[in-house]
Amino acid sequence: LRAVMKPITKYSDNTGGGNNTASYVTSTTDYLPLLSEFEYHGTRTYANSAEQNFQQQYAYYQAGNSKVHYKHNATGTAASAWCRSVFASSTYYFCLVNTDGSANNNNANNSWALAP
């Protein structure tokens, strides 16, 4: 699988805890990235406000499709899913998508779904 995956450059707050510090938004090369808060929702609620200057909402979500993710072993049960965006006002929190598809954040030591 890795042999056919293509690298993609993503911009995110890769420092955290700096509120809305623009210089904290840097690039990384990923092969299977988590989406950012802005790429899901097209708005910023918790992430560093400078992230959105380098991102766009995915067309799939912009078209109004559901942001809800489901458990692989209980496909009728919704699961919260991590975003790659850090919560700008915290050192230990990341953004996530709630079970109803809305934006939220939670402590990084919690277990939530991963949905690239």
Where are the regions a protein language model picked out?
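Collagenous Gly-X-Y triple-helix signature in extracellular proteins
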Residues: L1-A115
